[in-house]
């Protein structure tokens, strides 16, 4: 394991506020928003590039697979390098990747851009998890960590609807130009507000996997894998589902996704507050919401436009709390090795996004839109069962 060196008095003065933590939360928001943006622009992007929606969905898979590998070994890859410089560098990579996506004339260029994005996302996720306690005074360490992960949660539910709104108003490429500009801003912000974050020691690849021997950590990661895999099997293709099965127009889809996003932000903080008292209860509430919404959509005959929109809000409320609750579960299971469990959690989370979008793409191309919602419901139900029978601590 790596250990952080004590901050200098100058560093402490700079980190008394939560501004550096907010800057990192902005970075996690941007990397996750960038990863998932194809969800909200899937139909126009596929049409513009002359590919099927299933193939377009692979852009999510590519990013998730690369990020999963990189996040798991990120601390070992950067060794003793100052985390401040590493974060700035890979936010610049994110800026370039989104610009290249906006310029992509075909799927090959798009795939290359998404590989770059996956590297950036993996590095930021893999390092950000352990920075909360380093950047805040002891009494605010938990709040700092929650804020950092709130960037992930909020992006998961709000980034895509905002991007869909921009794309429907100005074209799908404009959404990626906006993300590129935001990445450039975040890079500068990190340079201004983030103090040096040196480390002592070096992590050998594979050492952190020993934390999986803790049954609480393993259960928490299993819950994450199941619910996230199911979620992205369905949510990646939620736009064509809403258009074909619920009869929503593109404008109404954008509005429904925006409502989903607002609900998700609320869910993030409500479930996050509950997670501080009981990680298990928080997980069951979050995952239970996903189970209820996806099951109703999957087996409700497509549902009418209004009821489908309401169910999407319930989905957002539940999934908005998944990141903070499952990460809190894994941290509570092994408080002495939070950095190791967080890195593995991030890797598993991203791998599940990748696998989920692949499964969803295969299902939607072979069995249609309703079938992907059934996959989503099944994955979430399995996660809920694990949460019922397992405990964060022995």
Regions found by a protein language model. Give the residues of each.
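Helix-loop-helix hairpin linking two adjacent transmembrane segments in secondary transporters
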Residues: 107-109, 137-195
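Cytoplasmic helix-loop-helix junction between adjacent transmembrane helices
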Residues: 113-152
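Helix-to-loop junctions at the C-terminal end of transmembrane segments
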Residues: 70-83, 267-279, 364
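Primarily marks hydrophobic transmembrane alpha-helices of the MFS/SLC 12-helix fold
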Residues: 84-87, 110, 280-284
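Helix-breaking motifs and short loop linkers at transmembrane-helix boundaries and internal kinks
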Residues: 50, 82, 103-109, 247, ...
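C-terminal transmembrane helical hairpin of 12-TM major facilitator-type secondary transporters
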Residues: 281-326
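Conserved MFS/SLC helix-loop-helix module at the cytosolic interface between two early adjacent transmembrane helices
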Residues: 69-105
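Paired small-residue
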Residues: 93, 97, 108-117, 306-314
């Amino acid at each position: 394991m790596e250990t952080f060196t004590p901050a200098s008095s100058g560093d402490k003065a700079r980190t008394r506020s939560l501004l550096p933590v907010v800057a990192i939360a902005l970075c996690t928001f941007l990397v996750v928003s960038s990863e998932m943006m194809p969800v909200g622009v899937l139909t126009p992007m596929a049409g513009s590039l002359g590919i099927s929606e299933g193939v377009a969905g692979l852009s999510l898979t590519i990013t998730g697979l690369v990020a999963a590998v990189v996040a798991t070994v990120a601390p070992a890859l950067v060794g003793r390098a100052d985390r401040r410089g590493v974060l700035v560098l890979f936010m610049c990579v994110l800026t370039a990747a989104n610009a290249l996506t906006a310029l992509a004339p075909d799927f090959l260029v798009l795939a290359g851009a998404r590989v770059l994005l996956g590297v950036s996302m993996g590095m930021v996720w893999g390092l950000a998890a352990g920075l909360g306690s380093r950047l805040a005074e002891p009494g605010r360490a938990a709040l700092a960590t929650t804020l950092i992960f709130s960037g992930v949660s909020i992006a998961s539910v709000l980034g895509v609807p905002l991007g869909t709104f921009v794309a429907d108003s100005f074209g799908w490429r404009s959404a990626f130009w906006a993300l590129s500009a935001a990445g450039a801003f975040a890079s500068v912000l990190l340079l201004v507000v983030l103090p040096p974050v040196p480390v002592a020691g070096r992590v050998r690849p594979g050492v952190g996997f020993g934390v999986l021997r803790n049954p609480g950590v393993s259960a928490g990661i299993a819950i994450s894998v199941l619910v996230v895999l199911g979620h992205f099997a369905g949510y990646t293709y939620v736009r064509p589902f809403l258009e074909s099965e619920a009869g929503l127009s593109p404008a109404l889809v954008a509005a429904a996704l925006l409502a989903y996003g607002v609900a998700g932000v609320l869910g993030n903080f409500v479930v996050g507050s509950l997670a501080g008292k009981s990680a298990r209860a928080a997980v069951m509430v979050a995952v239970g919401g996903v189970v209820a919404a996806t099951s109703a959509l999957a087996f409700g005959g497509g549902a009418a436009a209004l009821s489908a929109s309401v169910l999407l809000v319930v989905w957002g409320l539940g999934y908005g709390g998944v990141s903070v609750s499952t990460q809190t579960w894994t941290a509570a299971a092994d408080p002495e090795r939070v950095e190791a469990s967080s890195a593995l959690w991030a890797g598993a989370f991203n791998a599940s996004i990748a696998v989920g979008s692949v499964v969803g793409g295969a299902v939607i191309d072979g069995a249609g839109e309703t079938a992907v919602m059934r996959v989503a419901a099944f994955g979430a139900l399995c996660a809920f069962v694990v949460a019922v029978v397992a405990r964060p601590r022995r």
